[in-house]
């Protein structure tokens, strides 16, 4: 049925799609660079966060344990997306799909236990290495 609507080679359609996508991205980058406000000077190089200018220069690296928690959230959030897709097709996959989902959940639980034992989920404690 697809041949009746679009009589084009699938490879050519993919190439056209990739070329158009790359062209749109390039056009957006060029327009953004052309329209941005061009400022120079000492004030333009000062970091700006929340409307408050920094009182003193930053001394040393910033301890950011929330980055690790955010990365773990993204990893385990993907679990929910994959399991949702499995749940939609659960009747079609049968027992084999159930076993595969159980193995997937088991591997993620092992990863969670490892991260917990490693101290990756402790906010204020120093992680063991």
Curated annotation (Swiss-Prot):
InterPro entries in UniProt: NAD(P)H_OxRDtase_bac/plastid, NADH_UbQ/plastoQ_OxRdtase_su3, NDAH_ubi_oxred_su3_sf
Gene field: nuoA
Protein's membrane topology: Multi-pass membrane protein
Compartment(s) where it occurs, according to its Swiss-Prot or TrEMBL record: Cell inner membrane
This enzyme's EC code(s): 7.1.1.-
Quaternary context: NDH-1 is composed of 14 different subunits. Subunits NuoA, H, J, K, L, M, N constitute the membrane sector of the complex.
Record has Nucleotide-binding as a keyword: no
Pfam families xref list: Oxidored_q4 (PF00507)
Record's keyword terms, sorted: Cell inner membrane, Cell membrane, Membrane, NAD, Quinone, Translocase, Transmembrane, Transmembrane helix, Transport, Ubiquinone
GO MF entry, a single one: quinone binding
Recorded catalytic activity of this chain's protein: a quinone + NADH + 5 H(+)(in) = a quinol + NAD(+) + 4 H(+)(out)
Superkingdom field: Bacteria
Organism per entry: Rhodopseudomonas palustris (strain BisB5)
PANTHER family: NADH-QUINONE OXIDOREDUCTASE SUBUNIT A (PTHR11058:SF21), NADH-UBIQUINONE OXIDOREDUCTASE CHAIN 3 (PTHR11058)
Major enzyme class: translocase
Membrane-spanning residues: 14-34, 67-87, 95-115
Protein name: NADH-quinone oxidoreductase subunit A
GO CC annotation: NADH dehydrogenase complex; plasma membrane
Presence of the UniProt keyword Nucleus in the record: no
Function: NDH-1 shuttles electrons from NADH, via FMN and iron-sulfur (Fe-S) centers, to quinones in the respiratory chain. The immediate electron acceptor for the enzyme in this species is believed to be ubiquinone. Couples the redox reaction to proton translocation (for every two electrons transferred, four hydrogen ions are translocated across the cytoplasmic membrane), and thus conserves the redox energy in a proton gradient.
Membership in a protein family: Belongs to the complex I subunit 3 family.
HAMAP family, sorted: NDH1_NuoA (MF_01394)
């Amino acid at each position: 049925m697809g041949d009746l609507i679009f009589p084009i080679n699938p490879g050519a359609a993919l190439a056209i799609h990739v070329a158009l996508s790359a062209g749109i991205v390039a056009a957006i980058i060029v327009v953004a660079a052309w329209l941005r406000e061009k400022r120079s000077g000492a004030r333009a190089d000062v970091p700006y966060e929340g409307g408050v200018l920094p009182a003193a220069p930053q001394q040393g690296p910033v301890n950011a344990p929330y980055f690790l928690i955010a990365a773990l959230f993204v990893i385990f959030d993907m679990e929910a997306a994959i399991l949702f897709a499995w749940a939609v097709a659960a009747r079609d996959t049968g027992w084999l799909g159930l076993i595969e989902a159980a193995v997937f959940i088991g591997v993620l639980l092992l990863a969670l236990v490892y991260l917990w034992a490693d101290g990756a989920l402790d906010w204020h404690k120093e992680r063991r290495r």
